């Protein structure tokens, strides 16, 4: 498998991939403790499967140099991707990072983030920001292990989305200075 920089991604490119993940716990409060470097502790919740889907319009025309899209490719099939963009606050925002279930745990998430960090350094931005959810515990562990710092949370961000109303948005930062 190789990491490639591309300027578009289609449904055909990701056809047959399973980007879903299992929700089995949520990060325990108080969330403020995460900002102080506390260990991530969890509470069990009912097991469900979550899939963000794929909206081709999000990936039709990646506008370089302010957007970047890296893919994990084997035999011309995409098994994962990360989309990031330069934001108004001189930060890079990771908009999507997903991996097919068949390649999780093999270092490809780290390789994709390494490419984003390299790109962000080329841009000369202050750091990288991304959002996760309180019930995506595996992602929280991964971002913390990579070196992201917990920057805050928003308990109201998803209240207007019925299926996500109980989730809390977490914001993670990887500073480059």
Task: Annotate each language-model stretch with its function.
Residues 32, 94, 121, 138, ...:
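Short secondary-structure boundary/hinge segments and terminal tails
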Residues 76, 80, 107-109, 147:
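Conserved phosphate-binding and hydrolysis motifs of nucleotide-dependent enzymes
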Residues 91, 127-129:
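Structural preference for beta-strand elements that scaffold enzyme active sites
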Residues 1-3:
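Extreme N-terminal starter segment of soluble prokaryotic enzymes
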Residues 99, 105-122, 141-145:
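Conserved acetyl-CoA-binding loop-helix of GNAT-fold acetyltransferases
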């Amino acid at each position: 498998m190789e990491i490639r920089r591309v300027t578009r991604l289609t449904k055909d490119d990701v056809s047959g991939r399973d980007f879903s993940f299992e929700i089995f716990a949520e990060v325990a409060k108080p969330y403020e403790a995460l900002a102080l470097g506390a260990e991530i502790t969890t509470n069990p919740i009912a097991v469900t499967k979550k899939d963000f889907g794929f909206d081709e319009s999000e990936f039709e025309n990646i506008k370089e140099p302010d957007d970047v899209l890296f893919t994990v490719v084997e035999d011309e099939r995409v098994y994962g991707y990360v989309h990031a963009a330069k934001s108004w606050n001189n930060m890079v925002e990771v908009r999507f990072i997903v991996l097919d279930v068949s390649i999780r745990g093999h270092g490809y998430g780290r390789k994709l983030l390494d490419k984003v960090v390299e790109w962000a350094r080329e841009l000369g931005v202050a750091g990288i920001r991304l959002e996760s959810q309180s019930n995506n515990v595996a992602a929280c562990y991964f971002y913390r292990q990579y070196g992201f710092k917990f920057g805050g949370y928003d308990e109201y961000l998803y209240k207007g989305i019925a299926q996500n109303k109980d989730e809390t948005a977490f914001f993670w930062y990887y500073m480059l200075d």
